[in-house]
A protein has these predicted regions:
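Pepsin/retropepsin-fold aspartyl endopeptidases
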Residues: 23-322
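Bacterial N-terminal signal peptides
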Residues: 13-22
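Bacterial N-terminal signal peptides that target proteins for export
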Residues: 2-14
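A general, composition-driven signal for non-globular sequence regions
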Residues: 1-2, 132
Length: 322
């Protein structure tokens, strides 16, 4: 066999040696952050959450303090049922100052799905403080409150929203869920209720709404109005309730909250229930267009305490010991 030139041997070996080095060099080339962010955003829009998660993770390796990206990664992980990982990203995003309603909503959802119910309730309330009309958050929150045996708080939350819809000419949204909660409450042991001694109310549209039961009627949301003397009812509710009452004055002129003057009746209602607390002999006014509200003569039966934390306001009603 003829001898091979050593220079040819070296020439053959060098490409084989250099090729892996060249490939390694290519593999270490980073995709620009802007491109990763664009791809991740497109994947989110296309609901390809595996793609979104991968690209957000690569993006955050280069931009670790981007709070919006941290929140987006958490949402992608939430969508993939990776809730423990999502909670970590959401907490980082919030600690970095991110504060959007979708971040709060998905954070609450992941907290609930990892068994952190009390924290989830807090963050659902924060979500509603930003967007009160978010029905998914309201419905999910009500379910968690039922798990904690806070039935009336859940009913007030849903009834208040349905009352708002009715006032603007729309159909109630939570009728079915309210029926389910009322049924669960009737079947539960009252001694186990978290609301044996007090009821907590959430502020909606500038008002605290209390769950009130009148006779045979369903639980309704009443505005808590410390500036009004008497409780006001609608004629429709009074008729549905079939409650015992006495007419005190058959015809009076009353001024409504929006300034209208209407004809009304002053009555004395035998019994009403605010949450699970029964009140006897309650003075009230009723008319065809009266707004449902609890006046001072009913509220004076309770000790009221308000609280506000991180943008969320609550009012607690605790029956006075007479």
């Amino acid at each position: 066999m003829p001898a091979m030139d050593a220079r040819k041997v070296i020439a053959l070996i060098l490409p084989a040696v250099l090729l892996p080095l060249a490939l390694a060099s290519c593999s270490n080339t980073q995709t620009p952050p802007a491109e990763l962010k664009k791809t991740a955003t497109t994947c989110m829009q296309n609901q390809d959450y595996e793609c979104a998660e991968s690209n957000w993770q690569d993006y955050l390796k280069q931009r670790p303090n981007d709070s919006e990206a941290l929140a987006a990664l958490g949402i992608a992980q939430n969508k993939r049922d990776e809730h423990e990982q999502a909670v970590v990203q959401f907490r980082k995003a919030i600690a970095a100052g991110e504060g959007t309603y979708d971040l709060f909503y998905y954070y609450a959802d992941s907290l609930a799905k990892t068994g952190k119910t009390d924290e989830a309730i807090d963050w659902y309330y924060k979500t509603l403080a930003i967007v009160p009309t978010l029905v998914d958050a309201r419905g999910d929150l009500a379910k968690l409150l039922v798990q904690k045996k806070r039935y009336y708080e859940a009913l007030a939350l849903l009834a208040a929203f349905d009352a708002h819809l009715t006032a603007v000419g729309q159909q109630p949204y939570f009728d079915g869920q309210r029926i389910a909660i009322e049924t669960a409450m009737q079947q539960a042991n009252a001694a186990d209720s978290e609301e044996k001694t007090q009821i907590r109310l959430f502020k909606m549209d500038g008002n605290f709404m209390a769950p009130v039961t009148l006779g045979d009627a369903r639980v309704a949301a009443f505005v808590v109005d410390t500036g009004a003397t008497v409780t006001t009812l609608s004629d429709v509710l009074l008729q549905e309730a079939k409650v015992k009452y006495e007419v005190v004055q058959p015809s009076v002129t009353a001024t409504t909250a929006d300034g209208r003057r209407v004809r009304a009746r002053l009555i004395n209602v035998d019994s009403i229930k605010v949450a699970g607390f029964e009140l006897k002999d309650i003075p009230a006014m009723t008319c065809s267009t009266c707004q449902l509200l609890l006046g001072q003569q009913a509220l004076s039966r309770f000790d009221l305490s308000s609280s506000k934390a991180q943008g969320v306001e609550f009012l607690t009603l605790k029956p006075r010991k007479l």
